[in-house]
Amino acid sequence: MTDFINTSASRSLENAVQDHFIAAEAPWSGIVRKGQTIRIEDSYGQQAIDTLFYRADDFGERYSNQDTMRAQGGAYIGTGTKIISNEGNVMLVMTADSCGRHDTSAGACSCESNTVRFGHGTKYLHACRDNFVLEVSKHGMSKRDIVPNINFFMNVPIKPNGEMTIVDGISAPGDYVELVAEMDVLCVISNCPQINNPCNGFDPTPIRVLIWDGEA
């Protein structure tokens, strides 16, 4: 684990209003209020972090990968990207990105996809979809509310013919993204447990999430 990196004079470990260490393979969820900044940190490097966002007062409005990609005209997100909802509203804006590669197309691993990709022996391995089902259930939602997600720090090159392949991640220990909330949002994370492809370097590790109030 690396030392804390400052991206703003007004943000430090001491003035974070929330600071969460999320175990390898575990889910997490929390509210990010309008104007707050959330940092999602890949503490040990090469760890995919599957993430969903919902409007906090109306879960029917949620992150839309197709609207986000359409609005920015590209498949990858980075500093300056506006995270768009299925209602066409800006949910968050990415204000910092020390890695530069995040996937919006490959979705979350599941028991079903593990079976298809890696064989029947992997069917019951822990998967992100299980994490999402568990975590959204705490907020009165079900698997019907799980939509295509962002995979922070996951490296999925897309060829001109549309072919995609999950390859080794490029994130280093301590790499992070920061997003400012443009509305109150529920953030739901699956710290990806996948061990059958290189999205986690075949070794899932803990991550960290910090939240700060808006700058004075």
How would you label these PLM feature ranges?
Residues 1-216:
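Acidic, Ser/Thr/Pro
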